[in-house]
């Protein structure tokens, strides 16, 4: 089902309600959650209603909740697999040369990208640790009907831990730069010549950082954060998710962090 934050055809939510009967009572219990919060998802149990439960009732309900969780995880894995096959098949047919107004506006080149059948559309591959394509990020020539200049495709893709590599294979001891968006990654590589890892958004920096630590042991990791100084949380309070997520990822995987510095009413990305 659709969950908070879903756009387009995305449906990352799930729920299950079931009935349990003992000799004299009927209980209703269940769970709900969203896969948007990662591969393990967010899983919330609903408090059973219908009266006081025995220890046996609680064990039965616990077993059913765990079974429901495993069932949903299997469904999600199947959706990821279908999306990956679909994306990989389309990727093979896309041309390596083309034009993108998005890239021109950002003043970056196409590094490992391909171009869509719709004029002006560029696509960034999303790969997992095994280098399998799990999906793509579409960079539109102009914002779409929802006002978005970027969108993930196809529905059901596994975004957590997915990345795009730019530049040479890093030798032991060399620096690896990790960032959010493609334009930022391309700008960093064009400026430094270093290996850059695009994680697509701030929330994916930690999963991608863990994957890169496994792939590239002995390298220096530098998390290049967006400076989201204009952002506020749901309460309207200042919140800088770009810096927060980058610092947390660096501390967890063992790395350093940095963000762009501007004067006055500043910009917020390395591309700027």
Per-region residue spans from a language model:
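Non-catalytic accessory segments of DNA primases and related replication-initiation nucleases
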Residues: 1-102, 228-230, 235
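Acidic surface patches and DE-rich sequence motifs
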Residues: 22, 38, 116-117, 128, ...
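Serine endopeptidase catalytic core focused on the charge-relay Asp
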Residues: 95, 100-108, 128-130
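Phosphate-handling catalytic cores of nucleic-acid transaction enzymes
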Residues: 110-115, 134, 222
């Amino acid at each position: 089902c659709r969950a908070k934050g879903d756009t387009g055809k995305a449906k990352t939510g799930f729920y299950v309600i079931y009935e349990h009967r003992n000799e004299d009572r009927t209980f209703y219990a269940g769970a709900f959650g969203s896969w948007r919060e990662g591969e393990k998802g967010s899983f919330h149990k609903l408090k059973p209603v219908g009266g006081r439960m025995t220890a046996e009732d609680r064990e039965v309900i616990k077993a059913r909740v765990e079974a429901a969780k495993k069932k949903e995880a299997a469904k999600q894995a199947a959706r990821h697999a279908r999306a990956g096959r679909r994306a990989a098949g389309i990727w093979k047919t896309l041309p390596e040369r083309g034009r993108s107004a998005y890239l021109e506006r950002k003043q970056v080149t196409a590094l490992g990208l391909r171009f869509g059948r719709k004029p002006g559309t560029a696509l960034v591959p999303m790969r997992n640790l095994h280098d399998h394509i799990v999906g793509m990020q579409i960079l539109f020539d102009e914002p779409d009907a929802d006002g978005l200049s970027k969108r993930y495709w196809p529905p059901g893709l596994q975004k957590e831990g997915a990345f795009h590599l730019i530049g040479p294979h890093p030798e032991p001891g060399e620096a690896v730069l990790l960032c959010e968006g493609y334009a930022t990654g391309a700008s960093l590589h064009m400026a430094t010549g270093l290996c850059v890892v695009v994680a697509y958004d701030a929330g994916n920096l930690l999963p991608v950082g863990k994957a890169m630590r496994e792939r590239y042991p002995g390298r220096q990791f530098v998390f290049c954060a967006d400076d989201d100084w204009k952002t506020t949380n749901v309460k309207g309070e200042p919140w800088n998710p770009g810096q927060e997520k980058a610092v947390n990822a660096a501390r967890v995987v063992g790395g350093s962090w940095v963000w762009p510095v501007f004067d006055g009413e500043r910009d917020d990305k390395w591309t700027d």
